[in-house]
């Protein structure tokens, strides 16, 4: 895993946790939780790829890993749409920059997960 990606996740999560979006703070907390979950999932896939041949172990641990992979892609798509929406409605430049960086990170992570999953298939 790229150390820049790790610091990007940490930076964006820290920035998002500092935002005060009024009534939508509950939604923002949900986004933060999903970002953290996505990071952990991406990391676990990356570790499995690093141990090449770990597909059988991955399948034994979680017989529904393809279903889980599909669910993660749905979460990524939802997060991308949510971040795009927030980017459109916010007028605060700090929030705009944070959401633009979050969007870029989501797109990068989506590509990484696709790459990892193809290597495991």
UniProtKB/Swiss-Prot annotation:
Keywords: Host nucleus, Host-virus interaction, Transport, Virion. InterPro entries: Flu_NS2. One of its GO terms (biological process) is exit of virus from host cell nucleus through nuclear pore. It holds the Pfam family Flu_NS2. The keyword Nucleotide-binding does not apply. It is found in: Virion; Host nucleus. A motif (Nuclear export signal) lies at residues 12-21, 85-94. It comes from the Viruses. GO terms for cellular component: host cell nucleus; virion component. Its main location: virion. Belongs to the influenza viruses NEP family. Interacts with protein M1. May interact with host nucleoporin RAB/HRB and exportin XPO1/CRM1. Mediates the nuclear export of encapsidated genomic RNAs (ribonucleoproteins, RNPs). Acts as an adapter between viral RNPs complexes and the nuclear export machinery of the cell. Possesses no intrinsic RNA-binding activity, but includes a C-terminal M1-binding domain. This domain is believed to allow recognition of RNPs bound to the protein M1. This is Nuclear export protein. It comes from Influenza A virus (strain A/Turkey/Wisconsin/1/1966 H9N2).
């Amino acid at each position: 895993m790229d150390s820049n990606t790790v610091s990007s996740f940490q930076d964006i999560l820290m920035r998002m946790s500092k935002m005060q979006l009024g009534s939508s703070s509950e939604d923002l907390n949900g986004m933060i939780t999903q970002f953290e979950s996505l990071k952990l999932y991406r990391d676990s896939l990356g570790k499995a790829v690093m141990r090449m041949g770990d597909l059988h172990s991955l399948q034994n641990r979680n017989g529904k890993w393809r279903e889980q992979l599909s669910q993660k892609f749905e979460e990524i798509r939802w997060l991308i749409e949510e971040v795009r929406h927030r980017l459109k409605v916010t007028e605060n430049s700090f929030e705009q920059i944070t959401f633009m960086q979050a969007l870029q990170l989501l797109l990068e992570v989506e590509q990484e997960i696709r790459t990892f999953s193809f290597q495991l298939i």
